[in-house]
From Swiss-Prot:
Role summary: Involved in transcription antitermination. Required for transcription of ribosomal RNA (rRNA) genes. Binds specifically to the boxA antiterminator sequence of the ribosomal RNA (rrn) operons.
Keyword check for Protein transport: no
InterPro entries xref list: NusB-like_sf, NusB_fam, NusB_RsmB_TIM44
One Gene Ontology CC term in the entry: cytosol
Pfam name, any one: NusB
Protein name: Transcription antitermination protein NusB
UniProt lineage: Bacteria, Pseudomonadati, Campylobacterota, Epsilonproteobacteria, Campylobacterales
One term of GO molecular function: RNA binding
Recorded family membership: Belongs to the NusB family.
Length: 130
């Protein structure tokens, strides 16, 4: 059975594809999640995260942008943006424990983004969570 971390990793991939302009990615999400062996409760968890993030995208982007220091929002990489959006959604909307989400986001950044991303993502999500 997939873990929540694996489910979040898949959601980052879906958000990344969405950001690239594939707005129909939701139609294929079951197949994508199945490829990653994300099933049952974790699949439902993934759908909730993806759908909730997309539904709140404008507000999440505004919150992220508000907490950037010395960064232009448009200059943030797409992977980093996907991780920030997911983390902001879980902190602000899903009300998941802030420390857990920041840790998850940092771990996602370590495995999916460049070496400077974990610290950047930690700082932004920490500011959002306060």
């Amino acid at each position: 059975m997939a873990t929540r971390h694996q489910a979040r990793t898949a959601v980052v991939g879906l958000l990344y594809a969405y950001d690239l302009g594939n707005e129909n990615i939701a139609k294929f999400s079951d197949e994508i999640l199945e490829e990653d062996k994300i099933r049952n409760k974790q699949r439902d968890f993934s759908h909730d995260l993806f759908d909730g993030t997309i539904e709140n995208l404008e507000m999440l982007d505004a919150e992220i942008e508000k907490h950037l220091t010395d960064w232009d929002y448009d200059a943030i990489g797409r992977v980093e943006k996907a991780i920030l959006r997911l983390g902001a959604y879980e902190i602000l909307v899903a009300k998941t424990d802030r420390a857990i989400i920041i840790n998850e986001a940092v771990e996602l950044a370590k495995s999916l983004a460049d070496e400077k991303s974990p610290q950047f993502i930690n700082g932004v999500l920490d500011a959002i969570g306060k």
